[in-house]
Amino acid sequence: LKGVFNCTQLVIPHMLNASYGSIVNASSVVGLYGNFGQTNYAACKAGLIALTKTWARELGPKGIRVNTICPGFIATDMVKAIPDDVLKTLEERTWMKRLGEVEEVAKVYAFLASEESSYVNGSVIEVSGGISL
């Protein structure tokens, strides 16, 4: 949380000068729902959601949008290191029956950073294949 807070504090003055900006934070479905054995990770990612919503309220009137993305289990090196039996269970828990691809998450980041999302502020977007349904 400290790193996100410090970096955001550095860029906000520039965005305020422009009366425009988009901040897109990286949380996780674990920040929304928790996960066994991941107390510290869940707390950090939940904290990012709270920061996002607070900054959206504070900065939105000044032309700066703040949103966060909560990926589920995405085919990254970190997730691929999970034991195969656990990984198979995770895939079965999603309604898409597979891991997400990095590109699928990247497209959501690109959308939120663009003018195409000019009225999206304070949103928490889950990109998880429906794992929480």
Model-predicted regions and their roles:
Residues 10-22:
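A short helix-coil junction within the Rossmann-fold of NAD(P)-dependent oxidoreductases
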Residues 34-42, 54:
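Active-site loop-to-helix junction immediately N-terminal to the catalytic Tyr of the SDR YXXXK motif
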Residues 13, 57-61, 118:
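Alpha-helical segment proximal to the catalytic Tyr-Lys
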Residues 8, 44, 52:
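Active-site helix of classical SDR
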Residues 49, 70-81:
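Short, flexible catalytic-loop segment of classical short-chain dehydrogenase/reductase
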Residues 5, 68, 91-116, 120, ...:
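C-terminal helical subdomain
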Residues 28:
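Residue(s) in the substrate-gating loop at a strand-loop-helix junction
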